[in-house]
C-alpha cells in the first residue's frame, strides 16, 4: 500500500477584495482598501496548483464560498429581497458588508484539521472544520466548509466528518495552520503536533499585543475527536512574543513534511523541550526528526513575516527529494533568499526551491501554505475521493475559461453593493459546483 499527500488549494472567490479584516495579520491591515483583481488572484492560484500537479503531486481544488453572505446579513437585521439587504448594509454598515463579502476561505489551511487513517483508532481519515471564531468574517465559514469537504470525501467507510467546536475563545480553532504531522510514509503512523497560542484554563503564558487565535483546549478536543494515540500526539505552545510580531498562525513561523520540521529559532515556547518531545515520540515509530532551525541572526522574525518564508510548502517529489515552495517576496529579500540557497546545500532532504507569484493573496496576508489543506491518504482512500476536484490539464483549462467568463479584473469596496456582483458570484458558483460535481453546497442553491 502506498501513500499520498494531496494538497487541496482554495480557489479565490469572485468577491476577493482588500478589507484589512484580520487584526494581527500585518499584511492584511497594511493593504486595506487597495483595489483588488479577483481574476488575477484566481489565476495565480490556479497556476500554482497546475505547476504542482505537473511535478507529479496530487493536487485538489476547494471551491470558494457564497459571498456576499446574505443569510448572515439577514441574521443581523437587514431585510427585503437580496439586493435590498445588500443595499441597506452598504448604506448603514459598509464594514459589515465587507466582512460578509470576504474571500478569505481561499486560505484553506484554516478550513479544517485533518488526521490520516494511520493515526486514528477507527482507521478512518478524520476532518474537523475550524470554527475560526476569532474573526467574525471567517467564523461563518465552517458550515459550508463541512459541506464541501463532505462532497469530496463522501464514503463513510473511509472518512469521518466532525462539526466545528463551540464558537468561543476557550475552543478557538484555526485548523491545519496550527497543526503539523511528522513521520515517514504518508500512509504510516506519525506524530501529530498541535500548536496553540494560549491555554485558557489555568494557563499563564499569552501574547500581549495580538490575540492568540488557537487554544490548547481546542487542540485537545480535536485530538479526542480524531481518536489519536497520546503516545503519538504533542501539544506545543507557540512563542507568544512572535505572535505579537505578527505570527498569527504557526504556519507563519514553521512548516513540516514527513520527517522534516523547518522552523525559526523563536518559533516555540520552551523550544528545546518541545523538540525533544517530538523527537522522542518519533523515535517510538523508528523515525528521526530532521529539524532545520533558522537562526534569528540569519532571518529576523520581521523578515520571516514580511516574506512568508515559513508560510511555504514542503512537498516530497516523486523522486524522493523535497521542494520548498515560496512566494516571490522571499526571493526579493536578500537575507531570506541567501538562507534558502544555503539551506538546499545543507544535505537535508530539501534540495529544490520553487517560486510563485501570489501577490494578490500575499497582500491580504496569505502565502503558499495558507492556500492549501493537506490530506494524507492510502490507495483505497484516494480512489474513494470525488476525482472531479483533482487538478489535471482538462480541469485547469476549464477553470481558467470559467474565471475568464465569470470574474472581474478590478474590485473596490464600493463595488460590493453592486447588485450585479451578487448575481455574477452566484452564477459563477452554481456553474462551479457542476464542474466539480459538488451538488448543492450553497445556501442560494437550496
From Swiss-Prot:
Classification of source organism: Bacteria, Pseudomonadati, Pseudomonadota, Gammaproteobacteria, Moraxellales
Sequence similarity: Belongs to the succinylarginine dihydrolase family.
NCBIfam families in alphabetical order: arg_catab_astB, PRK13281.1
> Any keyword Hydrolase?
yes
Q: What is this protein called?
A: N-succinylarginine dihydrolase
Q: Which HAMAP family match?
A: AstB (MF_01172)
> Which InterPro entries does the entry mention?
AstB_sf (IPR037031), SuccinylArg_d-Hdrlase_AstB (IPR007079)
Q: Which domain of life is it from?
A: Bacteria
Report the GO molecular function annotations: N-succinylarginine dihydrolase activity
| Assembly, per entry | Homodimer.
What species was this sequence derived from? Acinetobacter baylyi (strain ATCC 33305 / BD413 / ADP1)
Q: Does the keyword Hydrolase apply?
A: yes
Q: Which reaction does it catalyse?
A: N(2)-succinyl-L-arginine + 2 H2O + 2 H(+) = N(2)-succinyl-L-ornithine + 2 NH4(+) + CO2
* UniProt entry keywords in alphabetical sequence: Arginine metabolism, Hydrolase
Q: Which residues bind substrate?
A: 19-28, 110, 137-138, 213, 251, 364
The pathway is:
Amino-acid degradation; L-arginine degradation via AST pathway; L-glutamate and succinate from L-arginine: step 2/5
Disulfide-linked positions: none
Q: Give the EC number(s) listed in the UniProt record.
A: 3.5.3.23
Residues at the active site: 174, 249, 370 (nucleophile)
What does the function comment of this entry state?
Catalyzes the hydrolysis of N(2)-succinylarginine into N(2)-succinylornithine, ammonia and CO(2).
GO terms of biological process kind = arginine catabolic process to glutamate; arginine catabolic process to succinate
